[in-house]
């Protein structure tokens, strides 16, 4: 031990005290320490901290059209007129000064300025201090472009860049306008033969004396290009032979990025890729027209080819109907799908298998072959049917809704059906062999496949058929349908439908009941049961006819994802080969719609207006898609 001051010579030092036991004790292990931080004054917060109120005033931005934009971004306004204290109000006001200046510069007021002022209203008994925050903006002069210069090499046509650049001398130096003009060049260039066009950094030289700005933009156009070949990489789903079915361009055609996007969309629509990219690649090959051939690199990655699907519906007279499907979209590559379908309903049961080749040698052309067994039991007839069919079709798709579509094919059907024999006065069962060549042509001038809002559609079905039941009887089934859609407003669509059908060359009683025409149901005249319209037997059951006419009008009102649809339908089926137009049956009702990405879900309730004996007072229909 030592002392602070030395002891005088000859003095005796005091003995050293015994050690304090606390100092010699072992240290507490680190794990035993309490690590909770000590509370400080700054940490103690009042559950009800004092608040001040303030009002916000903006001045000077209305005349340049920026007041609304400033208000939507203002820190003062976003604070809701409340702050912890006056210092916070002042800090928000400073933020809003800078905001006003940024907005002014964005539309060409580069000398713009803004100041803020905070005024306090003296408190009165029972009334706390209230502040008034005022931000005053001074726009200053508007800067305009004195010149516009695009620096690039030669292009074809020579005005390709200038004609598609929406800036000219005298325009205000407005950020959004400049960015939009530059973006347009990046769109137009690849659409017109320049897939590698790049925009450099713009330069705007301001002159505060004028006040103007000289605008310069470097543009690297790259080579003018034409389409070359398709090449592929990755885990291939399709080989080059099938890939070359999809392009809507030919080798040597001037490059257009829209056609590249279309190719990518068409490949994605097959549903067979987990990822896919289509990118132009320089080749250095020069074509006869001086353009460089650009190959398209298709990088593929396989996706899951199998899927399960299902639909459900209900309608008066048809009951519940459930359908489930299993699909392997690429079992027989390329795009050879196997589809197994099972129908389970209160009045219909069936099983079918379909082979479908999509994009069969031509884009959007489909070949399908189906084998199906079905049992159905309705008031009109019951039938046990086996069908073999094949069909070629040219279809619309979500990425290309075609004006003209069609299908044609062949069908062989064996069916055992019950029918009412008027000569015997009772129901009997007969077996029919039917061969048919069904065809359909549709002209579509509507704006949407699933939920049209304007335009019209015309559809013609013709099916030459032969029926063998004792002897062979040839005949022709025809159907003509037209629909029209008119947009009254953004939320109201008027829709109408007319349909007429005729069967020529055979007597009704020689025709299999399943091939006759019937009226009534969700896709026909709502308010009446499925197949209930037309001639009846003595028991009041429908027997069908050789002709049909129908009409419908709907008002489709939509609000958000929901809709209400009042409607009126009319129609009937007749024993004669041509519809008479007499004895029309009318139904009216109202429906609800829930709109989804794959079409509207429909619930319709209808009542017959001139009901017959045995007709229900109310009919209900549930399904996907509009009625027409």
Task: Walk through the language-model features, giving the residues of each.
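Residues that define the transmembrane beta-barrel architecture of outer-membrane proteins
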Residues: 181, 292, 318-320, 347-349, ...
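Transmembrane beta-strand segments that form the barrel wall of outer-membrane beta-barrel proteins
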Residues: 247, 280, 306-316, 322-324, ...
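C-terminal outer-membrane beta-barrel translocator/porin domains of Gram-negative envelope proteins
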Residues: 269, 307, 407-561, 566-570, ...
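Transmembrane beta-barrel wall of Gram-negative outer-membrane proteins
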Residues: 351-352, 357-431, 437-439
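Residue-level signature of outer-membrane beta-barrel architecture
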Residues: 328-330, 357-359, 394-396, 443-445, ...
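Outer-membrane beta-barrel "beta-signal"
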Residues: 438, 592-596, 600-601, 617-628
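Repeated loop/turn-to-beta-strand initiation elements of outer-membrane beta-barrel proteins
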Residues: 274, 306-308, 319, 331-338, ...
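Periplasmic polypeptide-binding modules associated with outer-membrane biogenesis and secretion
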Residues: 2-71, 75-316, 325, 339-357, ...
